[in-house]
Every structure is written in structure tokens, then in C-alpha cells.
Amino acid sequence: MGMRMMFTVFLLVVLATTVVSFTLDRASDGANAAADLVARGIRGNCCMFHTCPIDYSRFYCP
């Protein structure tokens, strides 16, 4: 296999990897939202006071 052919195969592999990665990333948008809520609850940094959505929105677990 010549250098030109190896370079072409390399470019095809990179292109295929990029396309697959991009497609999988778009398909998983928002899929981890429930897992994030569970992880925050397990870690114990949820704020359960009624003012938390206003004051500490990143720690609020609905």
C-alpha cells in the first residue's frame, strides 16, 4: 500500500470518526438530565429551601 493510499485511508477514518461522534453527541443532548439530578441528590448538595431556585439555582433539586 503506497503512502498516498495510506493517507487516504487515514483521512477516511478521521472523517468517519468525526461524523459518528457528532451524530451520537446530538442524539444524547439532554439524555443525562435525570442522571444529573440523581447524582446531585446522592452527593447531598441539594438545597431544599423554598428560596433555593432564586438564590442557589445550581444546588436546587426539584
Swiss-Prot record:
What tissues is it present in? Expressed by the venom duct.
* Any one GO cellular component localisation term in the record: extracellular region
Where is this chain primarily localised? secreted
Q: Which residues form the signal peptide?
A: 1-21
Keyword Signal included in the entry's annotation: yes
Q: What is the disulfide pattern of this chain?
A: 46-52, 47-61
Note the superkingdom of the native organism: Eukaryota
| Compartments it resides in | Secreted
Query: Which Pfam families does the record associate with it?
Result: Toxin_8
Q: How is it modified after translation?
A: Both Pro-53 and Pro-62 are not in cis/trans isomerization.
**Keyword Secreted: yes or no?**
yes
- Membrane-spanning parts: none
Q: Name the keywords, alphabetized.
A: Disulfide bond, Ion channel impairing toxin, Neurotoxin, Secreted, Signal, Toxin
Residue ranges annotated as propeptide in the record = 22-40
Q: Which GO terms describe its molecular function?
A: acetylcholine receptor inhibitor activity; ion channel regulator activity; toxin activity
Misc remark: Negative results: does not show activity on a range of nAChRs (alpha-3-beta-2/CHRNA3-CHRNB2, alpha-4-beta-2/CHRNA4-CHRNB2, and alpha-7/CHRNA7), calcium and sodium channels.
Q: Which family does it belong to?
A: Belongs to the conotoxin A superfamily.
Protein name per the record? Conotoxin Pl168
Q: Which species does the entry assign this protein to?
A: Conus planorbis (Planorbis cone)
